[in-house]
Each structure stands twice: as C-alpha cells, then as structure tokens.
Amino acid sequence: MEKRFLKLIEERPLVTREYTAQDGTKKVFHSKGYVFATGLDEFYAELTGDAARDAQPLDAEALYCMQGQIRQRSFTDKNGNRRFENTITILKLA
C-alpha cells in the first residue's frame, strides 16, 4: 500500500446533533469535516463521535497521514437515474 502525505485545505467547525436512538434514548452525534489535498486530488473526510468532539485544530502548514474508511451508496435521483456517493470517515490522523 502506497503512503501519501496530505495537505490540509480546509478545517470545518465541529457539528453536534441530538438524535433519538432506536431504544428511545437521547444521544448526541459529533462530526468535524476536513478537506485534504494529495497533490493530485482534493477530498472531504470526516471525524465522528468522541474523536471529532476532542479534536484539536490542525496545523495548516503540516502534512498528515490518514487511515480512513470509504463507503459508497447508490441511490436514485429525482429523474430516475442511478447515482453513487462516497463517504470517507477518518479512523486515524497523524
């Protein structure tokens, strides 16, 4: 697996949302988004949960390595076309 260093392009503010779990209890979901560049591409990725809540501001001058999980989902748009969406969740950031 090739390792690439990432440059921080944008750090989004922490977002906190309340929701009701399936068992009826109130829960809080935290997320914090980042835009990174590889030198060729730019992409958006999110930290979630306690990691997002506890995240310290990143140094815009530093380079980062990220371990993440990429998920895709397909959906049908309003015109009946099948579309795809990717979601990148940050697992580790160093």
Describe the residue ranges of each PLM region.
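Single-stranded nucleic acid-binding surfaces, predominantly the OB-fold ssDNA-binding core
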Residues: 1-94
